[in-house]
Regions:
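The substrate-binding groove and active-site-proximal loops of carbohydrate-active enzymes
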Residues: 43, 142-146
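A broad detector of the eukaryotic-type serine/threonine protein kinase catalytic domain
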Residues: 96, 141-142
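Catalytic domains of cell-wall/extracellular-matrix polysaccharide-remodeling enzymes
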Residues: 146-149, 154
Length: 229
């Protein structure tokens, strides 16, 4: 198979946590904006968008030729599914340009409820190789967001093996996780708050010490530099 490369200007996609931020991003030149609603996204503690603000934001962006993508990228449990179906029915009416999804069950519901809306596969789905990209392409996804931990060399290799029409999205700025996205269980273990449900407490940013079991109370601090930990 011969894959011909298109040379197009990359899309500058930025997050927006509120209607005001969305409008600012649009005015200052974003090509697209991604936002989260009050459920099913990974920023459970953020203010997020009401359905009314989401509709207003999408309308404003479209007036300025800017696209809006809505996140629904939790790893869903059984009791999330009916709510997700209702949510996608509401989103269908306000016409976002794409849904950002990581869970195959959520993907299936979105395809059924709003087949006219593009689906992008979230970085939360651990997209680390070209076969994963091809899998999602065959399921009907147009874009896959690379795992944030991939190198430019790895992303270039993926590009060589996927259809020219398939889009790759990559983060160039933002928080990094200690683990591949979606694979960290620290928050759930320490606090009972599930990172894959949008409630991460970021325990990877806490300060830790090492204790030898026969010397309780003697804490050795942990440092990291260019030589390691």
């Amino acid at each position: 198979m011969v894959i011909r490369m298109r040379r197009e200007k990359p899309e500058l996609l930025v997050p927006a946590s509120s209607l005001e931020v969305l409008k600012t991003a649009v005015i200052f030149g974003a090509d697209a904006v991604y936002i989260g609603g009050e459920a099913f996204g990974l920023r459970a503690k953020a203010k997020n968008f009401s359905m009314e603000d989401m509709a207003a934001g999408i309308a404003f962006a479209h007036e300025h030729g800017v696209k809006v993508y809505v996140t629904a990228n939790i790893l869903a449990h059984n009791d999330d599914l009916e709510g997700a179906r209702a949510y996608f029915n509401e989103l269908k009416e306000i016409k976002p340009d794409a849904l950002i999804i990581s869970d195959p069950g959520m993907f299936m519901i979105a395809k059924e409820v709003c087949p006219e809306i593009e689906i992008h596969i979230s970085t939360q789905a651990n997209n680390t190789n070209y076969q994963t990209y091809l899998f999602w392409w065959q399921q009907g996804a147009r874009r896959v967001v690379s795992a944030r931990e991939l190198s430019l060399k790895e992303i270039a290799e993926i590009r060589k093996h996927i259809p020219d029409e398939m889009e790759i999205e990559s983060f160039i700025h933002g928080a990094m996780c200690i683990s591949y996205s979606g694979r960290c269980l620290l928050s759930n273990y320490f606090t009972g708050r599930d990172a894959n449900q949008g409630a991460c407490t970021h325990p990877c940013r806490w300060k830790y010490a090492v204790v030898e079991e026969k010397r309780p109370g003697e804490y050795l601090p942990v440092y990291e530099n260019e030589r390691g930990t």
